C-alpha cells in the first residue's frame, strides 16, 4: 500500500518487482485520475499484478488484512502518520502478521511518538525500513 501515491510510479515499480496486489491511497482528485491513467496504460504489460488506486483520506483508510508492505514517501506530518499507524496496527491485530514499513525521507523516525512493536531494521540514506509485529 502506497500512502500518497501521487501519479502511481511506486505502484508500477512494485508490480515490476513482483508484487501482485498493489494499492495506492491518494486524496487529490487530479492525482487519482493521473494515477488511474498511468496504471491503466501499464496494466496490459503486466497482467499478473492487480493495481488499484483509491481516493481516500489516509487517516480513514482501513488496510486490508492481506497487506504486508506499507510505503510512505514523506506524504504528511506527524498527526496524520500517527492516525495511519493506528489503522495499520488495527489491521495487524485483526489478522496477526508481521508487516514492513518503507519510509522514504525518514519522517517516521523523526516524530516523537512510539509505535508499539515497530522495529527499525535499517536505514540507507533517506530510506528507513521498519518491521511491525502484532502485540499478541
Describe the function of each predicted region.
Residues 33-65:
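S-adenosyl-L-methionine
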Residues 79-134:
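C-terminal substrate-binding/active-site "lid" region of AdoMet-derived donor-dependent transferases
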Residues 16-21:
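Conserved S-adenosyl-L-methionine
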Residues 24:
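Short beta-strand "acidic-cap" motif of Rossmann-like dinucleotide-binding folds
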Residues 3:
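Conserved beta-strand/loop positions that form the S-adenosyl-L-methionine
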Residues 8-12:
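Glycine-rich SAM-binding Motif I of class I
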Residues 67-80:
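A short SAM/SAH-binding and catalytic strip from SAM-dependent methyltransferases
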Residues 28:
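Conserved SAM/SAH-binding beta-strand->alpha-helix loop
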Amino acid at each position: 500500500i502506497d500512502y500518497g501515491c501521487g501519479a502511481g510510479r511506486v505502484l508500477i515499480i512494485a508490480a515490476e518487482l513482483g508484487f501482485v496486489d498493489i494499492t495506492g491511497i491518494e486524496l487529490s482528485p487530479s492525482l487519482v485520475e493521473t494515477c488511474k491513467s498511468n496504471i491503466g496504460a501499464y496494466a496490459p504489460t503486466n497482467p499478473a499484478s492487480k493495481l488499484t488506486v483509491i481516493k481516500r483520506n489516509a487517516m480513514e483508510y482501513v488496510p486490508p488484512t492481506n497487506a504486508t508492505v506499507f510505503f510512505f514517501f514523506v506524504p504528511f506530518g506527524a498527526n496524520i502518520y500517527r492516525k495511519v499507524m493506528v489503522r495499520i496496527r488495527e489491521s495487524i491485530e485483526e489478522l496477526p502478521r508481521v508487516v514492513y514499513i518503507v519510509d522514504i525521507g525518514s519522517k517516521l523516525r523523526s516524530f516523537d511518538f512510539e509505535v508499539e512493536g515497530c522495529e527499525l531494521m535499517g536505514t540507507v540514506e533517506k530510506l528507513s525500513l521498519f518491521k511491525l509485529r502484532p502485540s499478541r
